[in-house]
């Protein structure tokens, strides 16, 4: 093999190795940022992976909200009306967080079946429901409770 061909081959191999490394790094970064959505039924049935960041959503069960007296720790139960899952969260809940309304929690599922959330998202008005929660509730055969109409001020 003459020196020119050898040099070209070396450049092509180096370029392919560089492209392969770049693709590997990009895919690894994307994989870390993927948060799959799971319903309480899927979590209770063991379909959600342990110690992997997931999104869990459903309706907050009435009477399930427990706040710690001396910290920002909160514990509540989310349901899709078939099964329920407990979610713990340390921080200030969104202003629109209420029992009986839809939420999505981002966090990790531990071995006890509790989602340890680092972020809680609440619906932003009385008619909005996160798409994943709406689909999960529809698939479970139950619809989200209808929001009461807001009185319109006349005058």
From Swiss-Prot:
InterPro entries (UniProt xref): CcmE (IPR004329), CcmE-like_sf (IPR036127), NA-bd_OB-fold (IPR012340)
GO biological process per UniProt: cytochrome complex assembly
SUPFAM superfamilies: Heme chaperone CcmE (SSF82093)
Topology within the bilayer: Single-pass type II membrane protein
Residues bound to heme: 124, 128
GO molecular function: heme binding; metal ion binding
Recorded superkingdom: Bacteria
Functional note: Heme chaperone required for the biogenesis of c-type cytochromes. Transiently binds heme delivered by CcmC and transfers the heme to apo-cytochromes in a process facilitated by CcmF and CcmH.
Protein name in UniProt: Cytochrome c-type biogenesis protein CcmE
Species the sequence originates in: Pseudomonas syringae pv. syringae (strain B728a)
